[in-house]
Design a protein with these regions (language model features):
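S-adenosylmethionine
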Residues: 1-468
């Protein structure tokens, strides 16, 4: 089946979108009637159910209305399994897609009364109003009204009934839940709980421009509470638009999850930060890890590859803002075909941030769980293996390759590396984190002593080539 949305989400580095108002800058959110916002969320849900990525679906919304619609939409996507189970209890027949999306939107927003953004009666009233005001749902307005009024009357009993359904309880597809149970029998519930939580806003401080302690002081001076995480990261108590961050436009900080910030130091520390290193970032867009490598050493030069021209432009934009463009070369190329771009000189270090299911960043992209198919895992694992096989010969003897994915599935992590080591006797696994589970509190091997804080799911394996 052709699923064009897949291109948006098979990368380990993703554009971060958030529940919080306008985290990436722009104008202040414009208020709109709730019924209109519910219409827009319903339209986004229809698009996602048809195979459009959440990123693309939300980008189709008027930019002035997008922050509010996105905040509601993320909540709907996080509780969609429960909403669909409730709808099945309320309706003997499935309504047409626009009406079903609007009904599920209202149910997802209303079922948890303790943290609902609006009173349940208000949501019901405005959902019915939304149905009446659209020609595609007007005929179903009485049906939607009847279902939602019944939900208000029988709320506790209906929720108790759906509690017995695995998908309703955890709000992930059944195959996903069962896969996590096999892969992480002690941690699967914690992973799913983390997936349904709102992620923090974490920054990486550009230590080429400012140290972490002064940057924390600058945040405190404008009443932004933050704590230090990782070597050069800070985590905010609440998300804010980047335009409010001190020195953001001047390149003093970038938005990057704490787990993602481990990549650059893991690769560099074994090679020596003062050495004139030749580095490759094999799947580099949008450029955050390339930039971090350059921020941590002034002696390295990085070749940053990405097969997508539009995404490659974002690498350049990232490096320009941070003042690092003069020490990197950005190339549009397929990392799996080095014969088309490699000059024959081995690299001291390679960062392979491989295409993956992005199952570790579901809390930032809650649509992923509903778009993925279990067959995607096998397809992506094959692509990852091809990249490892193509890039390993490019590492000099004694050099290192850091393999990472933002996935919690073992097929894309530990199983992938076990297979690689079995077929490459010149490779050995250095101390590295392995599977970092979302909000994991377990001991992490190969991670600096600094607190990781609240982080996404990642996998890291640091491979060293035998010296001849």
């Amino acid at each position: 089946m052709n699923r064009p949305w897949l291109a948006h989400y098979h990368r380990a580095t993703l554009t971060i979108i958030s529940d919080s108002p306008a985290p990436t800058g722009g104008a202040a959110p414009l208020s709109a009637p709730l019924w209109h916002q519910l219409q827009l969320v319903g339209s986004v849900l229809v698009a996602i159910r048809a195979g459009t990525s959440g990123t693309a679906a939300f980008e189709a919304v008027d930019p002035a209305l997008r922050p509010g619609v996105q905040a509601l939409g993320f909540r709907v996507l996080r509780w969609l399994g429960r909403a669909e189970a409730l709808r099945r209890q309320l309706a003997k027949r499935t309504p047409p897609p626009p009406a079903d999306a609007l009904l599920c939107t209202a149910l997802a927003l209303a079922w948890r009364a303790e943290d609902s953004p609006y009173e349940p009666f208000t949501l019901v009233d405005q959902a019915v109003e939304a149905a009446k005001r659209s020609p595609v749902t007007r005929a179903q307005a009485p049906f939607i009204n009847a279902c939602l009024r019944r939900f208000l009357r029988e709320r506790e009993a209906l929720i108790a009934t759906t509690d017995r359904e695995l998908v309703a309880q955890w709000n992930h597809p059944r195959w996903w839940i069962e896969r996590l149970r096999r892969d992480h029998p002690r941690d699967w519930q914690g992973i799913l709980t983390a997936d349904n939580a709102q992620p923090p806003m974490t920054l990486r401080v550009n230590v080429q421009k400012v140290a972490v302690a002064p940057y924390l002081s600058a945040l405190s001076a404008i009443n932004l509470v933050a704590k230090r995480v990782t070597e050069s990261g800070v985590q905010l108590a609440r998300a804010v638009p980047v335009r409010q961050l001190p020195g953001f436009a001047e390149g003093e900080a970038s938005v990057q999850d704490a787990a993602a910030q481990l990549a650059a130091p893991l690769l560099l520390d074994g090679l020596g930060r003062a050495a004139p290193l030749r580095l490759l970032d094999a799947c580099a867009a949008p450029g955050g890890k390339t930039a971090h490598l350059l921020e941590l050493t002034s002696a390295a030069h990085v070749l940053a590859l990405d097969a997508d021209a539009a995404r490659s432009r974002r690498i350049g934009e990232t490096l320009d803002r941070l003042g690092l463009a003069d020490r990197a070369r950005v190339l549009v190329a397929d990392a799996a075909r080095p014969q088309a771009w490699w000059d024959g000189t081995p690299f001291d270090g390679i960062l392979l941030d491989a295409p993956c299911t992005a199952s570790g960043v579901v809390r930032r992209h809650p649509d992923i769980r509903w778009l993925r198919r279990e067959s995607d895992i096998e397809q992506l694992a094959m692509q990852q293996a091809m990249l490892l096989a193509a890039l390993w010969p490019l590492v000099r003897p004694g050099g290192r390759l850091l393999y990472c994915t933002c996935s919690v599935f073992r097929a894309e992590g530990s199983h992938q590396i076990d297979a690689f080591l079995a077929h490459n006797t010149d490779a050995r696994l250095r101390p590295s984190p392995g599977h970092l589970l979302p909000q994991s509190t377990s001991d992490v091997r190969g991670v600096p002593d600094n607190d990781l804080g609240d982080h996404d799911g990642f996998f890291y394996a640091l491979l060293e080539k035998s010296a001849r």
